C-alpha cells in the first residue's frame, strides 16, 4: 500500500486513503501513474539519489545526508509517496538503491514521521529476486527496475524472445515476485506486507558505523567497508 498510514494508535479516515499495489514489481506504466497521481490525499515527489563524480571524497556521504534531509522536509510538507530514483546524468554517479532506501527509511524513523509516507524506488542496479527482496525488506513498497526492463525490450527488438516486450516484462515481474515469495517462505513469512520493512538480513563486510547509520537494527558480525569504500567502488563502476 502507498500513502499516509498516519498514527496507528489513532482512528482516522485519512489513514484509509491508500493505493493498493498488486505486487512490489512495477511496470513503466504503473510507475508513471504513481508519480503522476493527482488526487486529494496523495502527494508524490521524486528525489534523485545521485552525486557528482568530481565532488571529491565524501561526496556519497554528503549526498545521503542531503537526501535524508530533503525527504524529511518533504514528508513534513505533506508528501506521502517518496520516489527515489538513481537515474544519473553525465558526470553523476548513482547511489546504490538499497543504500538510498535504507538511508531514507532510517532517517524518517528517527524523525518520527515514517508512517506518514511510503517509498517507491526507480533503480537500475536491482535485477535479481534477492535484490528485490532486500529492497522490500528495507521498506521499498514499489520497485521499478528500469534497466532490467530495458534489457528485455532490447532482446525483444532483436528477436531473441518468443514473446513481445510487454509480455516479457510481465513474465519477468511475475517471476521476480515469485522469487521474493520463495525467499519469504524460507523465513516462515506468508505475506509481502509482513516482510516489508522487517530487515531480516545480516550485513557482512561493513563497518558498524555504516550499518548503524543506514541499516539500523541489522545484525553485523563481520566488519569491513565504510561509506568511503562504497563511494570508491561506485566511482569505479561508473567509469567502467
Which stretches of residues belong to each language-model region?
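Short, ordered loop/turn segments at secondary-structure junctions
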Residues: 87-90, 124, 140, 147-150
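Conserved, mostly hydrophobic/aromatic
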Residues: 86, 104, 135, 191
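Catalytic cores of alpha/beta
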Residues: 125-138
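Alpha-helix-loop-beta-strand connector modules within alpha/beta enzyme cores
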Residues: 95-119, 171-176
Amino acid at each position: 500500500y502507498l500513502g499516509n498510514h498516519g498514527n496507528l494508535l489513532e482512528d482516522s479516515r485519512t489513514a484509509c486513503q491508500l493505493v493498493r499495489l498488486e505486487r512490489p514489481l512495477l511496470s513503466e506504466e504503473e510507475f508513471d501513474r504513481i508519480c503522476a497521481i493527482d488526487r486529494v490525499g496523495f502527494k508524490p515527489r521524486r528525489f534523485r539519489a545521485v552525486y557528482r563524480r568530481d565532488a571529491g571524497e565524501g561526496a556519497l556521504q554528503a549526498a545521503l545526508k542531503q537526501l535524508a534531509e530533503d525527504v524529511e522536509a518533504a514528508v513534513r510538507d505533506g508528501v506521502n509517496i517518496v520516489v527515489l530514483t538513481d537515474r544519473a546524468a553525465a558526470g553523476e554517479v548513482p547511489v546504490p538503491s538499497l543504500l538510498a532506501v535504507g538511508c531514507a527509511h532510517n532517517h524518517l524513523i528517527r524523525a518520527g514521521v515514517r508512517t506518514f509516507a511510503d517509498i517507491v524506488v526507480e533503480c537500475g542496479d536491482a535485477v535479481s529476486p534477492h535484490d528485490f527482496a532486500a529492497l522490500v525488506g528495507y521498506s521499498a513498497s514499489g520497485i521499478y527496475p528500469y534497466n532490467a526492463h530495458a534489457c528485455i525490450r532490447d532482446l525483444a527488438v532483436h528477436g531473441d524472445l518468443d514473446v513481445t516486450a510487454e509480455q516479457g516484462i510481465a513474465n519477468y515481474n511475475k517471476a521476480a515476485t515469485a522469487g521474493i515469495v520463495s525467499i519469504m517462505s524460507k523465513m516462515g513469512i506468508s505475506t509481502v506486507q509482513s516482510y516489508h520493512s522487517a530487515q531480516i538480513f545480516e550485513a557482512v563486510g561493513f563497518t558498524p558505523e555504516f550499518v548503524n547509520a543506514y541499516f539500523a537494527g541489522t545484525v553485523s558480525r563481520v566488519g569491513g567497508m565504510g561509506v568511503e569504500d562504497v563511494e570508491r567502488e561506485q566511482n569505479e563502476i561508473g567509469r567502467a
